[in-house]
């Protein structure tokens, strides 16, 4: 299944493959020492969203590289104040039937790689760290 990716209102060129969207909540065990000191209850604790990886064929579009360069610019001369590199990213899964769209909240690139595949095609990979995601109600057909 491929994914169409957009940020800043622009669709990024080329079909992408995306890693899984996951939300993980850690569990804490607590005891109520007054009522039953030997009974343990499990409650939710901190929720984390692991990074997602976008993978696409290497082409002329420089959107992945340009965004990654905003986070860690190559220092030449005085280092300017970094721009706001966090973006709202929309992932639109393409396939058969009605598929949902998701929005990554405050996403930013943590890694950018250019990979040489055994089939001879170069690919680029962008790893996005984000603060969470939400499903958008307007599904596409």
Locate each region found by the language model.
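Glycine-rich, low-complexity intrinsically disordered segments
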Residues: 1-141
């Amino acid at each position: 299944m491929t994914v169409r990716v957009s940020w800043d209102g622009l669709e990024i060129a080329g079909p992408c493959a995306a890693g899984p969207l996951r939300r993980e909540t850690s569990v804490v065990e607590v005891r109520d020492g007054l009522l039953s000191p030997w009974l343990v209850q499990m409650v939710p604790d901190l929720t984390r969203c692991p990074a997602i990886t976008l993978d696409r064929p290497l082409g002329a579009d420089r959107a992945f590289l340009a965004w990654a360069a905003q986070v860690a610019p190559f220092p030449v001369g005085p280092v300017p104040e970094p721009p706001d590199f966090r973006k709202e990213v929309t992932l639109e899964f393409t396939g058969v039937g009605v598929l949902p769209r998701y929005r990554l909240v405050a996403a930013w690139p943590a890694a950018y790689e250019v990979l040489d595949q055994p089939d001879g095609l170069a690919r680029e990979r962008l790893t996005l760290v984000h603060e969470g995601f939400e499903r958008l109600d307007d599904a596409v057909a």
